[in-house]
């Protein structure tokens, strides 16, 4: 009550914001006569003038009044439409990193031209984001004449464009496109093998239409680019036949040691490595099999994949044992957890090991779809320097926009007062009674010539209602969200006299329903219409328009409450545009999903006891309020899920930013030799530390082990034992320096042999390929970690903290593996100029040929639901011993009291 009184005295935050913006509107209006007096050429010259002033240090905010006045005057000349004052306010809100809630029919598309023009003056690009391709193309074409008049370029970014077309689209001052396409282009750019393959510029300003749909409804669903892990089934099988021909080399200290074995096994570190004899023998076998050219080596750059298959096959045969490490079940390899002995269906080893074991056991070799890159809309749109959005319904989600994106919501007043009549909900006992009442309402509308839009929560419900209307011989149209162009056409004519249109709640957004039908759409269907034809169509439309107004305007029928009030408000908002009359009513039954969950059997029983007869409905403001409270609960839960998922994804996002930043630096740098030098010293230093611990006694050194490791991993054949025997003063530090010097000399010799430029290009290619491979594996590892992390709740651990800790360990491990693998490959591979060209060509072909799957993945609710179950589960398990008190700490480990945490659910 005190809050209400204060608001009345000092006004709400929204009122104060609008008051401040109206002062700037007065400035813009004062400039209008001055801009009207300009010739077309003088008005067009303003763009160059503003750009020059920006370069001289003026800010966009300082230019705003003049820029908006310019766009308003240009729009009047090009379209014959002048921006209303409320549209100017909307434009200012959108320029200031905020969300503008503008009701249906208030001209959001025209409003967007104001901040789009202003922000495009910087030359850094503006992205106008829509929810489907049709709207992107429509808005780009609709606004192109205005922007072209002002000297701005406009383009549209849609699926199916090649790289050069996309590059042109992004080079435009203003680019229209869908949220999916902008996101996928960002991911594709971060998978490019050369700077020329990238299409996006740095992300400057995004203006998101239907912002609630993009940033809230689709926030849980990540964009994923995936591709099948290379199909090498045949290669695995052929290599598998060769492995049993190899002979294990005995340990040097055993009596049977002869030194002519083909491989060694280190069970402690789970490694199997080819000896020098083994390498020669395997090369001979591969040449006989036709897998290796006669003059080629297994260690040449183009045969890295073949070497990988040999190593995977060797490990599968020597380190992994059936019924110990895995079992064969239903023609599949199922991993056995080494700690628990339990099978882990669905889990697969990485690095091609699983396929190698499948080849060994003769079962079907499965290819995996590997995640190559992924990002959520939450994290993609937060990459922009400036972000703004507009929608007809944002106020109910204002808290979430502020919490997640830091965006305040401003409700823009309508140009004309809203006169739509929103009637109270009618609640029936059964769905059949509800549908009978809906049919009667529709029949009444048709008889008096009033158009009606019926909103359903699912396609299934819309088809059910369509079937009933067909039986009742009531003509109608059903919106199918699959065909956006058709959808807009149907919606545009949904205001015809007595028209009945059934639509799922989200269908047709972005297209206004004009009372009496859309006369412009009718004219567009004519070829070269004459002035007389246009006048005739306009006159006919005016008659229909007046008839619909007299019948009460567009009537909205909601067949069920959505779990979000915002979606219900969107449906209502289709009626009453620009001060037109209209009405809305929701019909509910106790069998509806929302009512079934939140209105218990007791309420249904009470309704029956009150003597409700069949076909009778309850209508009371209390009922409507109770339903809205139920919706608030669901909205709160969904917000918690999205926030929880964002906290998890933020961990991956931080890592993604680091990897993509490093990758882009790598692409833009021609010489990375200094980086390679630092990495090489790090890797050798770490290996030496393993065998010669720092500041340790000589008795603790494992010099033979270090010799063998340097030789097997880095092709560095150094007589360390001989050095130590010959030089008593060769202490740890000096030995370390000598090893690093020898490694540097060997690498310098390689550079002399192949040439500086060839080696620089090869270093870059190896670094990119290794980073991409390890990043893919890291994404898979993160997925596995995320799927099981909720189980930590059972151990009274916080799953989020555990996820952060373990994912950091995985990332650190990935970076260490990257350094080691890059140094190992560069040390062992024999580089030739043709190898570099072949490797780059191989990368290009793989990128172009690999069938990629672009998915807007299913909503990732499972993680949050699992986490909630895991956290709540201890309450269930310990109930027999001790009931959790309302004021006790919640067993989930959140630190909150039980009544404020999971106690709310009960």
UniProtKB/Swiss-Prot annotation:
Enzyme class: translocase
Sequence segments annotated as region (Disordered): 875-897
Record keywords: ATP-binding, Cell inner membrane, Cell membrane, Cytoplasm, Membrane, Metal-binding, Nucleotide-binding, Protein transport, Translocase, Translocation, Transport, Zinc
Residue positions binding ATP: 87, 105-109, 512
SUPFAM superfamilies: Helical scaffold and wing domains of SecA, P-loop containing nucleoside triphosphate hydrolases, Pre-protein crosslinking domain of SecA
Membrane topology per record: Peripheral membrane protein
GO molecular function: ATP binding; metal ion binding; protein-exporting ATPase activity
Reactions this protein catalyses: ATP + H2O + cellular proteinSide 1 = ADP + phosphate + cellular proteinSide 2
Principal localisation: membrane
One example of a Gene Ontology biological process annotation: intracellular protein transmembrane transport
HAMAP family: SecA
Subunit text: Monomer and homodimer. Part of the essential Sec protein translocation apparatus which comprises SecA, SecYEG and auxiliary proteins SecDF-YajC and YidC.
Role played: Part of the Sec protein translocase complex. Interacts with the SecYEG preprotein conducting channel. Has a central role in coupling the hydrolysis of ATP to the transfer of proteins into and across the cell membrane, serving both as a receptor for the preprotein-SecB complex and as an ATP-driven molecular motor driving the stepwise translocation of polypeptide chains across the membrane.
Name by which UniProt lists this protein: Protein translocase subunit SecA
Organism name: Aeromonas hydrophila subsp. hydrophila (strain ATCC 7966 / DSM 30187 / BCRC 13018 / CCUG 14551 / JCM 1027 / KCTC 2358 / NCIMB 9240 / NCTC 8049)
């Amino acid at each position: 009550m005190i809050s209400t009184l204060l608001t009345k005295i000092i006004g709400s935050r929204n009122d104060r914001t609008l008051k401040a913006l109206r002062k700037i509107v007065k400035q813009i209006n004062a400039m209008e006569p001055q801009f009207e007096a300009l010739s077309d050429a003088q008005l067009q010259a303003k763009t160059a003038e503003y750009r020059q002033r920006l370069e001289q240090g003026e800010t966009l905010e300082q230019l705003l009044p003049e820029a908006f006045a310019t766009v308003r005057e240009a729009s009047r000349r090009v379209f014959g439409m002048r921006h209303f004052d409320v549209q100017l306010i909307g434009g200012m809100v959108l320029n200031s990193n905020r969300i503008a809630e503008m009701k249906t029919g208030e001209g959001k598309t025209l409003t967007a031209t104001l901040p789009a023009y202003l922000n495009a003056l910087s030359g850094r690009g503006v992205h106008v984001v829509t929810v489907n391709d049709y709207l992107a193309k429509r808005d780009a074409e609709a606004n192109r004449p205005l922007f072209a008049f002002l000297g701005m370029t406009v383009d549209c970014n849609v699926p199916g464009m090649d790289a050069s077309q996309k590059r042109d689209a992004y080079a435009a001052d203003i680019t229209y496109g869908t949220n999916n396409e902008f996101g996928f282009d960002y991911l594709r750019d971060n998978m490019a093998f050369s700077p020329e393959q990238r299409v996006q510029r740095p992300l400057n300003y995004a203006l998101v239409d239907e912002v609630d749909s993009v940033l809230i409804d689709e926030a849980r669903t990540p964009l994923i680019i995936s591709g099948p892990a290379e199909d090498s089934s045949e290669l695995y099988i052929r290599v598998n036949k060769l492995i049993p021909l190899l002979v294990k080399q005995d340990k040097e200290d055993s009596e049977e040691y002869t030194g002519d074995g083909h491989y060694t096994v280190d069970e402690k570190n789970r490694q199997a490595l080819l000896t020098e004899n083994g390498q020669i023998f395997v090369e001979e076998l591969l040449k006989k099999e036709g897998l290796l050219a006669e003059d080629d080596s297994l260690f040449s750059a183009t045969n890295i994949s073949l070497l990988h298959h040999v190593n995977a096959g060797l490990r599968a045969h020597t380190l992994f044992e059936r019924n110990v490490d895995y079992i064969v079940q239903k023609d599949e390899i199922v991993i056995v957890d080494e700690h628990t002995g339990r099978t882990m269906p669905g889990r697969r080893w990485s690095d091609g090991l699983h396929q190698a074991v499948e080849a060994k056991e003769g079962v079907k070799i499965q290819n995996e779809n590997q995640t190559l890159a992924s990002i959520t809309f939450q994290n993609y749109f937060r990459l922009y320097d400036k972000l703004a959005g507009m929608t007809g319904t944002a106020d109910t989600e204002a808290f979430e926009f502020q919490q997640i994106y830091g965006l305040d919501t401003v409700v823009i007043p309508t140009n004309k007062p809203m006169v739509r009549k929103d009637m109270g909900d009618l609640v029936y006992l059964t769905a059949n009674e509800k549908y009978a009442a809906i049919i009667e309402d529709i029949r009444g509308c048709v008889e008096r010539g009033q158009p009606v839009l019926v909103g359903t929560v699912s396609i299934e419900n819309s088809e059910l209602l369509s079937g009933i209307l067909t039986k009742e011989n009531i003509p109608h149209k059903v919106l199918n969200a699959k065909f956006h162009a058709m959808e807009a056409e149907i919606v545009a004519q949904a205001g015809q006299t007595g028209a009945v249109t059934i639509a799922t709640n989200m269908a047709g957004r972005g297209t206004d329903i004009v009372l009496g039908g859309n006369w412009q759409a009718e004219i567009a269907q004519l070829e070269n219409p004459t002035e007389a034809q246009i006048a005739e169509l306009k006159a006919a439309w005016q008659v229909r328009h007046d008839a619909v107004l007299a019948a009460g305007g567009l009537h909205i029928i909601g067949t069920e409450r959505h779990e979000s009030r915002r979606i219900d408000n969107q449906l209502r908002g289709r009626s009453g545009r620009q001060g037109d009359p209209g009405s809305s009513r929701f019909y509910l039954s106790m069998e509806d999903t929302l009512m079934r969950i939140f209105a218990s059997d007791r309420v249904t029983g009470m309704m029956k006891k009150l003597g409700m007869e069949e076909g009778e409905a309850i209508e009371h403001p209390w009922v409507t309020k109770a339903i809205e409270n139920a919706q608030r609960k669901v909205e709160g839960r969904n917000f918690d899920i999205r926030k929880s998922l964002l906290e998890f994804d933020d961990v991956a996002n931080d890592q993604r930013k680091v990897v993509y930043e490093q990758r882009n630096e790598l692409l833009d740098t021609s010489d990375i030799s200094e980086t390679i030098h630092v990495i090489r010293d790090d890797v050798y230093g770490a290996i030496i530390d393993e065998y010669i611990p720092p500041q340790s006694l000589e008795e603790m050194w494992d010099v033979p082990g270090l010799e063998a490791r340097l030789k097997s991993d880095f092709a560095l054949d150094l007589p360390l034992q001989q050095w130590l025997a010959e030089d008593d003063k060769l202490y740890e530090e000096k030995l370390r320096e000598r090893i690093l010097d020898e490694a540097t000399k060997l690498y310098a010799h390689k550079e002399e042999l192949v040439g500086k430029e060839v080696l620089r290009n090869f270093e870059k290619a190896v670094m990119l390929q290794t980073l991409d491979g390890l990043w893919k594996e890291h994404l898979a590892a993160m997925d596995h970690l995320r799927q099981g992390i909720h189980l930590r709740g059972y151990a009274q651990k916080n799953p989020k903290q555990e996820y952060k800790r373990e994912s950091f360990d995985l990332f650190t491990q990935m970076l260490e593996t990257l350094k080691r693998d890059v140094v190992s490959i560069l040390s062992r591979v024999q580089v030739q100029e043709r190898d570099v060209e072949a490797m780059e060509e191989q990368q290009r072909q793989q990128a172009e040929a690999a069938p990629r799957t672009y998915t807007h993945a299913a909503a990732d609710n499972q993680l949050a639901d699992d986490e909630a179950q895991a956290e709540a589960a201890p309450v269930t398990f310990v109930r027999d011993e001790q009931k959790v008190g309302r004021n006790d700490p919640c067993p989930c480990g959140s630190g909150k009291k039980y009544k404020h945490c999971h106690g709310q659910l009960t």
